[in-house]
Amino acid sequence: MKITAEMIKELRQQTHAGMIACKQALEKTEGNLQKAIVFLREKGIVKASQKQDRTTSEGLINIVFSQNDAFLYELNSETDFVAKNEHFQQLMKTIGEVILQNKLQSVDEVLTFNYQNKTIQDLLLEKTSILGEKITLKRILKVTKKEEEIFGTYKHQGGRISVLVVLENNHPSIAEDIAMHIAAFNPKFLNPDKVNLQFLTTEKNILQKQTEKQLLEEKKPLHILDKIVQNRLNKLLKEICLSEQPFVKNNEQKVKDYLQNNNTNVVSYFRWSIANQ
């Protein structure tokens, strides 16, 4: 497969690796971007965290509520300047009202919904014409909780990052604290038991290759490989699992201990950042 300049540029944007390294990675993986990223990580050229929060557009994420239902939705613009414009802000509010009042759960449902004798898609096109930038509704998610549970939310930078938490018991301030923590620490999983098996396998393979390379370079015995890999994997899990992270308001206490002390637990959480799935 021919490796193009655009493919190299995209890989460099996501990894910050050098041009030659990106070209070699793409050649080794036959142009597969995700496999090329893993290849660079195995070689120790790039870390996983470097691509996590890159944004491809601007906009805002909002959360609206109706009793036991919450709806997250993301509206994109091309620049931050337009996202702060009153026309964009009003459109954001209108879409939230339409979603909430009609319990709409997909982008298609919203775009085809008739609002004041026009569809929401028509409204987006109107705002695109007024603002001079393409305005798009990217995604929607409905979250339903039980009666005894509670929602907690936190918005960073007005909605560039928005977090929704479902907590077991009715503790509003605790739910908000956990949502703020998630916005800041960006955990990938709720706890070690919830870690995706494919993710775990991929990370372990990468750590094995990195560690083996390091041991060979340092002329150390390979029989210690498995122990080092497991220790590094355990450290990674502590960093990416919500329950194991140091609590944002007290770094001497883990999140799971904070929750246990307050007799509650996190049922689920959703952290959205602009233009990232």
Curated annotation (Swiss-Prot):
Q: Does the keyword Protein biosynthesis apply?
A: yes
State the coiled-coil residue ranges: none
Which PROSITE patterns does the entry mention? EF_TS_2 (PS01127)
> What subcellular locations does the record give?
Cytoplasm
Write out the ranges of the annotated region (Involved in Mg(2+) ion dislocation from EF-Tu): 79-82
Q: Which GO terms describe its molecular function?
A: translation elongation factor activity
**Under the cellular component aspect of Gene Ontology, which terms does the record hold?**
cytoplasm
Where the protein is mainly located, per its record?
Answer: cytoplasm
Is this entry keyworded Ribosomal protein? no
Q: List the disulfide bonds.
A: none
| Keywords (A to Z) from UniProt | Cytoplasm, Elongation factor, Protein biosynthesis
Q: Which NCBIfam families match?
A: tsf
Sequence similarity: Belongs to the EF-Ts family.
What HAMAP family would the database entry show? EF_Ts
Its job: Associates with the EF-Tu.GDP complex and induces the exchange of GDP to GTP. It remains bound to the aminoacyl-tRNA.EF-Tu.GTP complex up to the GTP hydrolysis stage on the ribosome.
Name-wise, this protein is Elongation factor Ts
Please give the organism. Phytoplasma australiense
Q: Which gene encodes it?
A: tsf
